[in-house]
Amino acid sequence: MDLTGKLLIAMPGMGDPRFERSVIFLCSHGEDGAMGLIVNKPADLNVSTLLEQLEIPSSSAAAARAPVRLGGPVEMARGFVLHSPDYAGKLQSLKVSDGFVMTATLDILEDIARDNGPARAALMLGYSGWGPGQLEAEIGDNGWLTADADPDIVFGSRDDGKWEAALKLLGIDALLLSASAGHA
């Protein structure tokens, strides 16, 4: 089962507080493990502040307001931009699926600062990673649900409500979801 390009939705009984109510976009998934980006955990800075810290001049009003998110607990000083496929990065862009591309170079930040970036983008610091078989075991233990990725959830600017919206993709009302899970 290849879950690349899908959403992981944390179940209410998620034992790890770093992933409580998380929605994660899976950038890669295979026999060597999985890598994803949390799309609904805000960082304590916005893109404008990050551009200042990186000494990248910005003339973009949109970048000034754009949030930065915590993509996960691994390599939190490393940045990733998940974006729409309309942007053709110069180097190292990974097409994840038809509607999503990931770029991890400064080029995209410079282009975003000049309003030459992708139409839709989400910037994350750090990522979430799983070793071989680890994610499958967590799914089997009812830690995660999976759903098709929705660009409005992934790229939406408001983080509150993304978890509930992701559950609705599966026809699930968050208020009716139990923190306890069983196996039939």
Swiss-Prot record:
Concerning SUPFAM superfamilies, the annotation shows:
VC0467-like (SSF143456)
Offer a single GO CC term for the protein.
cytosol
Q: Gene3D superfamilies attached here?
A: VC0467-like
Domain of life of the source: Bacteria
Give the InterPro entries listed for this entry.
AlgH-like
Pfam family name, one: DUF179
| PANTHER family per the UniProt record, alphabetical | UNCHARACTERIZED PROTEIN YQGE (PTHR30327), UPF0301 PROTEIN YQGE (PTHR30327:SF1)
Q: Which family does it belong to?
A: Belongs to the UPF0301 (AlgH) family.
What HAMAP family does the record point to?
A: UPF0301 (MF_00758)
- Protein's recorded name: UPF0301 protein SPO0296
Question: Which organism is this entry from?
Answer: Ruegeria pomeroyi (strain ATCC 700808 / DSM 15171 / DSS-3)
